[in-house]
Amino acid sequence: EILRTVYQEEESAGKCRKLAGEIEDGIKRYGITELPPFGKIYAYETDGLGNYVFMDDANCPSLLSLPYLEYCTAEDEVYKNTRAYILSEENPCYFSGSVIKGVGSPHTKKGNVWPIGIIMQALTSGDAEEIKECIDMLLASHAGTDYMHESINADDPEDYTRSWFAWANSLFAELLIRVKELGIYDAGGKGQ
């Protein structure tokens, strides 16, 4: 759109649209596969020869973030199946502890959950209770710093990486603005 509307570069815009179509076709042809008991899901990686990696990483973009990125809707059947997989113990990057649960990353130690993953879970949810649970976990896990961290030990919020992670803080602010607009969460006027 920018190439076409701002720079009037129709030829370049056409090449980009063609490439986008080829990528979309590749995702549909090679990136969706059956994974019992979840059904058809998006693979995290594929070689196009029938080999797949099943997982999701808490970063954005991620499979969990697909509706946030407007690739599909949260009601898309393949996405719903993929989301169920991502937020389950079957995902090797999903961790559940006594303080928080959610998606982590191979980039940080096993057992650490990323606030970005919890925030993305809330941003892509239509369930007010799930959103509230996500916010409550985030509020319970900042270790008294009032900042979102890169990752947090699911059992010990004092054990975290990056004391101040602007990416997570920015997404958390976006989440709070959205839930305020929707009127689905009240932190009780505690300034949290």
Predicted segment positions?
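Extended ligand-binding clefts on enzyme/binding-domain cores
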Residues: T5-G117, T124-G126
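C-terminal capping/lid segments that line or modulate ligand- or cofactor-binding pockets
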Residues: V53-T73, G111-Q192
